[in-house]
């Protein structure tokens, strides 16, 4: 069985979603991008964009954890999983907005 990353690497065109949450901690940016080519011939075309704001509570907790004050490993683990869920929701919203099936994302 061929490794899934090798299969992805060999595709001429890949459909991906990039996620980011910056230092303002105001929400998640998600971009749907088609990547074609390889090496110096690589090209990226943005097909869609979505911003999903964090709730005031989530933003406050992110800033508290980033502030260097007292926090437990459990606090960071909870935030890690919550951010994963919020990034996933942003990706799902972006796919719905652009009419892209989740199964089409590489």
Language model feature labels by segment:
Residues 1-106:
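Short acidic/glycine-rich loops and adjacent helix/strand connectors
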